[in-house]
């Protein structure tokens, strides 16, 4: 197997932390997003979507979404389960993963890609050139503040989102919280459950 990634970026970080907790190392090529290497013909010949991560398995087939790569690695290496230990926990991890990705992560991405001049004409990842929509920046701020409230409530009396140990859901939330800093959004001091969660997960991941 061979992994194409860009470790500093939020989406690839989800996989980096997952592999770290699993104790897995894969041959990896870094695709520099800052230099737009993901849009070069050499990489698009590997992954036409022009995104990272991309895992090329031994058969030559590719997995290009974090959730799919994590599921594949989890099935190959079931020790230290990070996607739930029971049927219910597995479903809950997927549910939280989807919620975090479609709410907090996407809200931050909307703010970044629609408000930062570096993404002018590239408001979405990949090869499709789309104009920025400034109104999505303001909407993203509102969505993020709502997410803090929802997530802080969800963590009341809990160390982790699912079960009694860290899972992919916690990794995703931790990455999303840090990603929010890229658009100068911070967890409010009143969200004590979220702040404690961040410290708890940071001690495990960093």
What residue ranges belong to the model's regions?
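GST-like domain detector, emphasizing the conserved glutathione-binding G-site
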Residues: 1-134
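Short, cationic motifs built from Arg/Lys/His that form the positively charged side of catalytic pockets
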Residues: 14-16, 200, 204-205
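Aromatic-glycine hotspot motif
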Residues: 55, 67, 142-147, 206
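GST-like fold's C-terminal all-alpha helical module
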Residues: 103-202
